[in-house]
Amino acid sequence: MDYFELECAVENWAEEKGILDKDQGPDNAATPMSQALKTLEEVTELCTAINSDDREEIIDAMGDIMVTLIIQAKMQNLSLEECLESAYNVITKRTGKMINGQFVKDN
């Protein structure tokens, strides 16, 4: 599958699992915040995998992060593509420098 087929498959999976179903009731319905917390959980797993230099776990965590972001985008009536394009359009104009292994933007 190409990327866009995978994105669509993830959206369909989320629909099938009821993640995007707003009629799950207040205690069971997924919300943008609960999905954001799931993303944070997966990012933590990525950090653990990187710290352990575990390539398979890095791949798994990055994939899981993408899944949570695709679902979040769907919840927000956005596409990951438009979010990425928006961010790219901002960063291409950004100036800054590398500090301690990270790019730090100028104010």
For the regions a protein language model found, what residue spans apply to each?
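Flexible "arm" and connector segments at domain edges
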Residues: 1-62, 66-107
